Regions:
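Residues that form generic nucleotide/phosphate-binding pockets
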Residues: 16, 40-41, 53, 106, ...
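Amphipathic protein-protein interaction modules
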Residues: 67-125
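Residue-level signal for secondary-structure boundary elements
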Residues: 50, 62, 66-67, 115-122, ...
Length: 147
């Protein structure tokens, strides 16, 4: 399935921090089937690794692919690849397309909720070397979103 997703659907996604004995981290919840790819990509118990991997790609518009899932920008295409507009998010089962602006808004909300949760629950990542750089990246993305 290759579909263009309306901005409003993405803007209405609910991103929460869950803190239980079974899970600690961000979740994308109450998702329509059209947005399953986003939910599966962003909801992981290994969120520190995911964030380290994708944050600079979001900021610099460089695609990130891990285990056949990820996101790409038109600038990532090789000669002869089928062109597209916006941002492609994909996994082995589905591919969806978002506008550039809604992708930035989504990732800004995701990163801001992550910073809020990690700070509130005093997660170990706050002491990691990469965390300060991530905060700078998140701030730049927030500034891009807010103009």
């Amino acid at each position: 399935m290759n579909i263009h997703i309306e901005d409003q659907l993405v803007d209405n996604l609910k991103i929460i921090w869950e803190e239980t004995t079974q899970y600690s981290g961000l979740k994308v919840v109450d998702v329509s089937p059209k947005l399953r790819v986003i939910q599966d990509f962003l909801t992981t118990q290994f969120w520190p690794s995911l964030v380290r991997f994708i944050a600079s790609g979001v900021l610099n518009r460089h695609g990130r692919i891990k285990e056949y899932s990820g996101f790409m920008f038109p600038e990532d295409l090789d000669p002869g690849d089928d062109p597209f507009e916006g941002v492609m998010i994909f996994d082995p089962l589905d591919t969806i397309y978002l506008s550039d602006t809604v992708f930035d808004r989504l990732m800004n909300r995701y990163f801001q909720k992550l910073i809020e949760g990690a700070t509130k629950y005093e997660k170990d990542v706050l002491k990691e070397d990469w965390w300060i750089e991530f905060l700078d990246i998140a701030k730049e993305i927030e500034q891009r979103v807010n103009g």
